[in-house]
Amino acid sequence: MTDPIMSNETIIRRSANYRPPIWDFDFVQSLKSEFVGELNIKRIDKLKEDVKMMLNKTMAPSDQFELIDTLQRLGLAYHFGDEIKRIVKSIYNSHRNDNTWMKEDLHTIALQFRLLRQHGYNISQEIFDIFRDELGNFKECLHEDIEGMLSLYEASYLLEEGENILEVAREFAASCLKKYIQVNKDQLLSMIVSHSLEVPLHWRMPRLETRWFIDIYEKKQGMNPLLLELAKLDFNNVQATYHEDLKYVTSWWRNTGLGEKLSFARDRLMENFLWTVGVNFPPQFGYFRRISTKVNSLITVIDDIYDVYGTLDELQLFTNAVERWDVNAMDQLPEYMKLCFLALHNSINEMAYDALREQGFHIIPYLKKAWADLCKSYLVEAKWYYIGYTPTLQEYMDNAWISISAPVILVHAYFLEGSPITNEALKSLKEYPDIIQWSSMILRFADDLGTSSDELKRGDNPKSIQCYIYETGVSELKAREHIQYLIGETWKKINKEREYIDSPFSKIFIEVATNLARMAQCMYQHGDGHGIEDGETKDHVLSLLVKPIPM
């Protein structure tokens, strides 16, 4: 029997040949964790109190920062935000008043530099001058200090524009670390170094890094069993909250009928939820993850309507309907678009109602504008496709940082992350502040590096790599290197935004925007992790959302 929503006898439609989802409704609804219940919560609370005592104990600043770094990498820092904030502020203020800490070793100074910058303190790159010779080069004797080299390498990724000392530090440390793993004197340390060289800590998706680091920490000499037990219990407890989030969003998705009726589109609910875990993992942000998953799923379907299925006339009608944000605009839409538009309209209006009820702000104008801007950017790319136009890289990026959908994701995230809504932030939000633009750029570049080959094979528009090749005549390898360079340059701008100077946005929102960039590099590191489910993405889903850590 032919589906009336999908049938069309006169129009030839393209197909991306996306595979059906590997995580079905029944599988998600069956997810169950044994790491829930009063006994687990009591044990976690007891261990948390023990850690608070450790944090409040008098110890050297270097030991305090080692503990904070371990807590962050084990995914536990969110429990101790006030204590960590107090310690970091105290150490920063003491550093401003004396230079005794400059007598520390390279590892300690680099670790403190990284953590202070991570927490928004603009500590000078010149603290590394004591490790440089009169010509400005890092001293050759540092080659033997692998732990110091690793810390220096990780610290260098928090650089901002114009910080040449950190550029030189990165090259020096990377060269040393690459030589070390060839010798492989210490298997565990070599594994940690290789992991860092593949993707630096500052660019990694936090929750996936936590899962990896828990296994590493267990093998480390001097490991604290208390911290390890808490990390495992907490990871499994948080995973159990994800199960409840997933059951909610899979029921919502099934009720929309979009996965069933619009078979040309990617049905990727589990992957869309994984994005939200990458962006904001703590358990208390369940509402954030649930609504963000709806947003991500709607974006995925609408993207496929513009990229694959819709005709140019239909796409113009859909764009107009979203701009009007009026259910009466549905009358002119074909049947398959009516279903999508109504799901979009109802889901976003429901979120706006929650914001009006809870905070007294009418946010539909901001949400509507973000969706309209997205659809208009999709329409630009559709027109380019139909006339066979290849833009310059700059012309492409002027549109593509919006069409990658990060502005829509982050505008919604602002209203979901729980901080008070302010008029100053709303004014900035309308024009898409720098933190949104820079996060969007990295998502676009990472997506293009991971997906452009597959998309070109099925006849899609040229992406940033192809635009740069067309414009300059360089090889694909050189073009990819250029896009990687642009990712690095954009990270410098994000790092500047993370100083929170005169920002109308909360630290939570800026962290969410940063994490979106991190999640992009995770999802597209080995290809199209969003469209193709059965590679690295499947492993990520299993390790973060399905399989608990053995105790």
From Swiss-Prot:
Instruction: Cite the binding residues for Mg(2+) 2.
Output: D303, D307
Q: Does the keyword Cytoplasm apply?
A: no
Give the transmembrane ranges.
Answer: none
Can you tell me which residues bind Mg(2+) 3?
Answer: E455
> Is Magnesium one of the keywords UniProt gives this record?
yes
Q: How is the cofactor bound?
A: Binds 3 Mg(2+) ions per subunit.
- Matching CDD domains: Terpene_cyclase_plant_C1 (cd00684)
Cofactors, names only: Mg(2+)
State the EC number(s): 4.2.3.-
Q: Which SUPFAM superfamilies match?
A: Terpenoid cyclases/Protein prenyltransferases, Terpenoid synthases
Per the Swiss-Prot or TrEMBL record, what residue ranges does the short sequence motif DDXXD motif cover? 303-307
Q: Which UniProt keywords apply?
A: Lyase, Magnesium, Metal-binding
- Which annotated residues bind Mg(2+) 1? D303, D307
One of the entry's Gene Ontology molecular-function terms is: sesquiterpene synthase activity
Comment, domains: The Asp-Asp-Xaa-Xaa-Asp/Glu (DDXXD/E) motif is important for the catalytic activity, presumably through binding to Mg(2+).
What's this protein's family per the entry?
A: Belongs to the terpene synthase family.
* PANTHER family named in the record: OS04G0344100 PROTEIN-RELATED, TERPENE SYNTHASE 10
Q: What is this protein called?
A: Terpene synthase 10
The organism encoding this protein is Ricinus communis (Castor bean)
